[in-house]
């Protein structure tokens, strides 16, 4: 358990723990629960590999970094879900670093790519390669789109998408292509208020 003053901000549980002489630990079915800035979240996986802070450390003391393997799921109470097969969770900053394929969903917005970093404090997801995003159509059947680019930044606080490198947007009646595309979403993330395309 980790505290900030008298307030509990994180706890970890597992089904089985093995500890080695070099301080390395392996845990089965790890579950990390945190609550920072009033935004509860949960991280789970099939297995976790971590390094103890020091010799003789209490097994319940949370490490700074945990490598997660198998069915990694990062879920925030306010809507963001990230799925991967491998990731590294940094406890103190609440960031999730994914080296391989990843998918995400946040209300009507979903997508994925290869390689990603999610910063909980900034509420920003960065997709590093083969990025894609989909907005589901509204109640009337309009307003939806799909987009692809090399890299993509999804800023949940400002409701903003930045697509860089061969950006393509496909809407109901048109396909748009540019080097870079910026998309501004509604506050509810259920529609587009502005779209800017730059370059060929």
Go through each PLM region and give its residues.
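Mature-chain termini and adjacent capping regions
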Residues: 1-200
